[in-house]
């Protein structure tokens, strides 16, 4: 899996800061603080400044400086850097970003957001603030069609998961997101908001990929580093026990243990993957937390030769972890393109009888339950709106043509085994470059069914975002 670092510099005229007494009513760091049609707060909480990105969007950026006088305000240019990393999950790429600073956990929880049954019921899902800023600062300024601009603005408000793919993201993105949600809930959000987070930092991560580049190696204290990462997540989640938190656990990892044990890196990582996944499930077993282990997708573990070994593996992990209450089930189609339910199988799925996620889950669940794991499911539909896609083969994962934004996140799935349809991967970040001379070039990104020309993995891919937007089903 390629890991790409992108420095995004934001610089614009900073707005004057309000007096301290008013800041409790201001937007949090990374929150929106202005723009055409925006009716929310136009000031920022202490430590950040409202910076205009374009006519449609102003954002609270940390560390911005502003000087004021009694009659006028003089704005200085502010630059905020964020590290951006990308990860290939189930044959495609997902993105997560982190500010390069550490924040202090404000206050403490006075209640516990415990739940019974489906953790997606009785809550609202939180829209990813960084993805919102990407859409408003990178996508919308390049769109001239007013209707498409309005549609893009609507995409920015769709709740999506936040990825913790490096240790630095724990004390930055996780704390900031939970702080923002706490503030919104304390301000009277009804129903309250819940957080959606991806735990994703195993050593020797994504073992079957052509160019894995996670931050830790098993041979270099990786297991202990990962336990520290999980321990810190646990500490923060306990501090925010008033915020219900839904976790996807380690995309690709266990699925690779089913199908890719012929890959030396995977066979070498197998025992560590199992040990650390069990460690994470035990440590994050908290009353306000719900966990879903990643279980690939219909075109991966859904094949008849793979589905029973997959059931055996996931049930064994669940049992060895002590059947934690917070382990609700499995996540499928993470960062992929598969339909939830389609009337006839696309040609590229043949001859798999489980040609969509519904068939996969309905075949998978009884096998799991028979082994003591009555798993519920969540299904990523962020890029699954257009069916069939333009893929020539099911394994063609990179920037697939003919895709669109899919059904919006909801707990109203109409299916007894499915807790929610979700957007684990927000659309618009590139899966990989089509430049054959690039160091991170993967041949999948140069295939005829991959959209080209494509920038490096993790960079904003405007043409792909607009493809998803134009093909969205339902439309925005």
Curated annotation (Swiss-Prot):
Classification via InterPro entries: Beta_cellobiohydrolase, Beta_cellobiohydrolase_sf, CBD_sf, Cellulose-bd_dom_fun, Glyco_hydro_6_CS
Catalyzed reactions: Hydrolysis of (1->4)-beta-D-glucosidic linkages in cellulose and cellotetraose, releasing cellobiose from the non-reducing ends of the chains
Gene3D superfamilies: 1, 4-beta cellobiohydrolase (3.20.20.40)
An example Gene Ontology molecular-function term: cellulose binding
Ranges for domain CBM1: 33-60
Region feature Substrate binding loop 2, mapped onto this chain: 423-461
SMART domains registered for this protein in UniProt: fCBD
A Pfam cross-reference name: CBM_1
Region named Disordered: 67-94
Entry EC no(s): 3.2.1.91
Glycosylated residues in this chain: 144, 153, 167
Disulfide bonds listed in the record: 33-50, 44-60
GO biological process: cellulose catabolic process
PROSITE patterns, sorted: CBM1_1, CBM1_2, GLYCOSYL_HYDROL_F6_1, GLYCOSYL_HYDROL_F6_2
Subunit and interaction comment: Monomer.
Family in the record: Belongs to the glycosyl hydrolase 6 (cellulase A) family.
Record-given protein name: Exoglucanase-6A
Gene: cel6A
